[in-house]
UniProtKB/Swiss-Prot annotation:
It comes from the Viruses. This is Uncharacterized protein ORF70. It comes from Acidianus two-tailed virus.
Length: 70
């Protein structure tokens, strides 16, 4: 299995075509537990903070969504 960082990097690359990613998407795509999906999602949020022009994390009700700015 890939590491959390590797999966987050893949999702970061796919974010432009997918436009947004939720923790539920990560569970569905990679068939992982919610705790692993949350860890991947957290790394993805940090990557967005480092590359602020490319994506951002926004709250939608009770959910946080990573949204592409492009």
């Amino acid at each position: 299995m890939q590491s959390v960082n590797e999966v987050a990097q893949q999702l970061f690359s796919k974010l432009r075509e997918k436009k947004e990613i939720t923790a539920e998407d990560i569970i569905a795509i990679y068939n992982v537990t919610p705790s692993v999906a949350y860890a991947i999602f957290t790394v993805l949020k940090v990557m967005c903070q480092q590359h602020q022009g490319e994506c951002q994390a926004i709250k939608r009700g009770r959910k946080t969504v990573i949204v592409s700015k492009q």
